[in-house]
Amino acid sequence: MINRKKSIITLCFVLMLPFASWAEAPVIDDSENFAMIDRQEEYDAPLVNPKYDNPQIESAELDGSQNDNYSTDTSQSYDEPALVKEDRSTISDNAKLIDKIQQLQKEIQELRGQLEVQAHDLKLLQQQQVAFYKDLDSRLSNSSTSAKTIQNDKPATDVSLGSNSPATLKAASPQIKRGPSTGPSNSKPQPVIAVSRANPA
């Protein structure tokens, strides 16, 4: 499978090579070398017949009619307000972006704070659940040990499963021995411990 993928990728590259040779013209950036080419042309030009035998020198004295046709406007008032408007718009856009970034940073800080609070609450809930299950386990283990001691204290009785006659039921039920009653009972009632069955979480 891996060899198959490699061969497909290699085949694609091999098929793309002819497309590069069929390109119409290569793209060359001559912006840096443009001045060097001009200098080389000056040196390569023939010295026998120069292009301009008599160079034309412009005279500073022009006729008035020709001078009126060429008006020079050096104020360029149309450029300045446009630049100012662009500067103002970019400044206002930048200010809006900065405000939005600050608002987003505040929201992120608030969300991080909420996340920390929720993580703390979750940790407390987990601790409460662990405490609840440990308490439940200790109660169950205490009740199972007390049930075992009660079963060990009972006398062994022979119970036959075959008949349900009243004689066998009387024999199967444990006998409670009561001593002579000389008055009120000497045993003190044990206090009742209130146990909450609600989930502490």
Swiss-Prot record:
Gene3D superfamilies: 1.20.5.110
Matching Pfam families: TolA_bind_tri (PF16331)
BP GO annotations: protein trimerization
The organism's place on the tree of life at top rank: Bacteria
Xref: InterPro entries: YbgF_tri (IPR032519)
Compositionally biased residues, Polar residues: 64-78, 143-167
Stretches for region Disordered: 46-80, 143-201
Name of the protein described by the UniProt record: Uncharacterized protein in pal 3'region
Species for this entry: Legionella pneumophila
